[in-house]
Amino acid sequence: ELATRSDERLAELEAHDVLVLAVPLYNLGIPSQLKAWFDRILRAGKSFRYTENGPVGLLKGKRAIVLGARGGQYAGSALDTQTPHLRHMLGLIGINEVDTVFAEGLSMGDEHKEAALTTAHAEIEALIARL
């Protein structure tokens, strides 16, 4: 049954050119539900293969958009472990074109929250225009 669910998730991913992930920052990481999704799609021989030079992704020609929400400000700091983690997991399966838009500082007061959301919305609109 687990292999069937995994095959279904992989088929969904293979059927589309763009993957959009909406990802809150939970304790400097990704939500457990997203980790479980990655556990379903990261399969040797299906989404990547092992070679003498390391793993090679099999899902070519796809891109990902990561939309993130964060209570504090982490982008560009050592505490932003989420962005490299997602890039590594996506890269493992061959998705190396990854755009990110983060609304940061959402727990730092209403004024900061509104400014962050306005900026994120503008970045999303610009990203959509480029697709």
What residues fall within each predicted segment?
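Glycine-rich phosphate/pyrophosphate-binding loop and the adjoining helix
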Residues: 76-131
